[in-house]
Amino acid sequence: MKTLPLLLLLLLDLGQAQGTLDRVPLRRQPSLRKKLRAQGQLSEFWKAHKVDMVQYTETCTMEQSANEPLINYLDMEYFGTISIGSPPQNFTVIFDTVSSNLWVPSVYCTSPACQMHPQFRPSQSNTYSEVGTPFSIAYGTGSLTGIIGADQVSVQGLTVVGQQFGESVKEPGQTFVNAEFDGILGLGYPSLAAGGVTPVFDNMMAQNLVSLPMFSVYMSSNPEGGSGSELTFGGYDSSHFSGSLNWVPVTKQGYWQIALDEIQVGGSPMFCPEGCQAIVDTGTSLITGPSDKIIQLQAAIGATPMDGEYAVECENLNIMPDVTFVINGVPYTLSATAYTLPDFVDGMQFCGSGFQGLDIQPPAGPLWILGDVFIRQFYSVFDRGSNRVGLAPAVP
């Protein structure tokens, strides 16, 4: 007698999860690293930023959103469009789960990066209101600074009113100059927000714009435009994954932080024998970990230094070991084709390693970061209502 009500509840839950969904298309474009490599300027980029990606790893405290590792954005390939103001002013952004602020270039910004991207013009918006609070986010080459304003923000038909956002007036370094994106929309917890700003997704929930307090990410592995890649607000789409979601509790609210049981290479445990912490991050393209562990991992997969970065012999992909992250008792296995980044340089195939050293200091770290290399293989659901992350094998 209890079977029917239970079935109805399951169907209701499934309907909510897949019913009223607001989809934001994500387009895939060549990363800044690929563009610099193709232009023969990558080594000059490392020198200009005083970074040796083989011998040095960027150190980050990550105690708040006001400190971001700049290298995270070098390999970003997935971007979406938002609009701010009325009439709308469009911007290309990274949807980033490891930060919580929204910022775009201001018309008052004189940095070279701002001149290369659309700039927000408050005088041209009928719904803009000045807040005037200064904000600052520290990056590897300096601080991005600006002021906070408020306006309506639209994301694929979802319009948040009174959203506070950063108008950058200074953007550091060359990374933002050549980037495909104009700004960043953070999807982390409110505790990460610089200036005490309420994040966009929190306002979506508060203004009843989403049917469920969750969003999900599907990143297509198709290198040509990433057709089908999308960020979904209000639930998840089961057509993008196989099997069922493995729900993993968030261990610390701020980042989307979860526990790793262990990390295996070639089927044998290699790291985190007693467990460790990781964050699922749409704003980091690679998989990062403590530099001493990553050096061991690069050696285990056969990656060697080449022009300031780690690469493998492309013809060895079929004999390279799998790398498995065991999460909540479930193995998530990446084959060599999944954790390497193919490219062509001067007509020759190049296979870069998808792993990068990044030392995150206590009390936030050490942390592993499961970026796009991981998310491409595993559909990811971020559930604020139950403070958990859902993972399942992505459908190619």
From Swiss-Prot:
Q: List the disulfide bonds.
A: C109-C114, C272-C276, C314-C351
Q: Which modifications occur after translation, per UniProt?
A: Glycosylated. The nature of the carbohydrate chain varies between cell types.
Signal peptide coordinates: 1-19
Q: Please state where this protein is localized.
A: Endosome
Which GO molecular function entries does the Swiss-Prot or TrEMBL record give? aspartic-type endopeptidase activity
Please state the Enzyme Commission number of this protein: 3.4.23.34
Glycan attachment positions: N90
Major subcellular site: other
Residues of the propeptide region, as annotated, are 20-53
Broadest EC class assigned to this enzyme: hydrolase
Give the record's GO CC terms. Answer: endosome
Q: Which reaction does it catalyse?
A: Similar to cathepsin D, but slightly broader specificity
Q: List, alphabetically, the Pfam families matched.
A: A1_Propeptide (PF07966), Asp (PF00026)
Q: Is NADP among this UniProt entry's keywords? A: no
Occurrences of domain Peptidase A1 (ranges): 78-392
Top-level taxon: Eukaryota
Its GO biological process annotations read: antigen processing and presentation of exogenous peptide antigen via MHC class II; proteolysis
Gene3D superfamilies per the UniProt record, alphabetical: 6.10.140.60, Acid Proteases (2.40.70.10)
Report the active site residues: D96, D281
Which keywords describe this protein according to UniProt? Answer: Aspartyl protease, Autocatalytic cleavage, Disulfide bond, Endosome, Glycoprotein, Hydrolase, Protease, Signal, Zymogen
Under the subunit heading, UniProt states: Homodimer; disulfide-linked.
As for family, the record states:
Belongs to the peptidase A1 family.
Q: What does this protein do?
A: May have a role in immune function. Probably involved in the processing of antigenic peptides during MHC class II-mediated antigen presentation. May play a role in activation-induced lymphocyte depletion in the thymus, and in neuronal degeneration and glial cell activation in the brain.
Tell me what this protein is called: Cathepsin E
Supply the source organism for this entry: Oryctolagus cuniculus (Rabbit)
